[in-house]
Amino acid sequence: MKFNFTGKLSKSSMILLIVAGIFTAISAFTSVWRIDLTAPQYPEGMVLYIGGLDGVSGGDEGNDLYKINELNHYVGMAQIHPGDFWEFTALPIILGAFAVLFLVTAFIKNKKLSIASLISFGIFGVLGFIDFYHWTYVYGHNLSPDAPIKVPGMSYQPPILGEKQLLSFD
C-alpha cells in the first residue's frame, strides 16, 4: 500500500477536518473532566469540573469546590485553586488554535498540512494526558503529615478514566 501525501484533500477529508475544527472549538468552552462525589454525609453529591473557560470550578454555584477543599484538608491534600494550573488558562487558547488550524487546512485543502496538524493534535493530546495524570498524582499522593485523618497506604488520586471509591465517597 502506497500513501500519497501530496496534492489536495478529498471532499470527505475536508468535511472531517471541518467537523474536527468545530468540535475542537466547542471543547475549548466545556469542561474536559468531571469528578462526582457522593457519600452518606453528602447525599446530594458534589461535583468538580475541570477544563473549559473556568479552569476548575465546583457545582452548586462554586460551593462544591469549597466543600471539597475543606474535605481535602482532613486527609492532607492540598487545596485546589483555579489559578494553580497554568494549563487551564492555556487550554482554551491551544484548542482554539487547533480549531482554526483544522478549518484553515480544510479550506486550503493541503494534505501535508492536514497530516501535520492531526499528528500535532495527537501529540498535544498525549502530552495533556501525561500532564493531567501528573497533577492528579501529585494531589493524591503528596499528603500533609499533619493531616487530621491518616489512612496508612491510602492515596487519594482520582482516576482519569472510570471510578474509584475513596473512603466513604463513591
Residue ranges and their predicted role:
Residues 18-23, 85-107:
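Hydrophobic alpha-helical transmembrane segments
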Residues 12-39:
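Early transmembrane alpha-helices of polytopic membrane proteins
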Residues 1-13, 95-112:
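Cytosolic-side transmembrane helix boundary signature
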Residues 6-22, 110-123:
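Alpha-helical transmembrane segments and their helix-start/interface "positive-inside/aromatic belt" motifs
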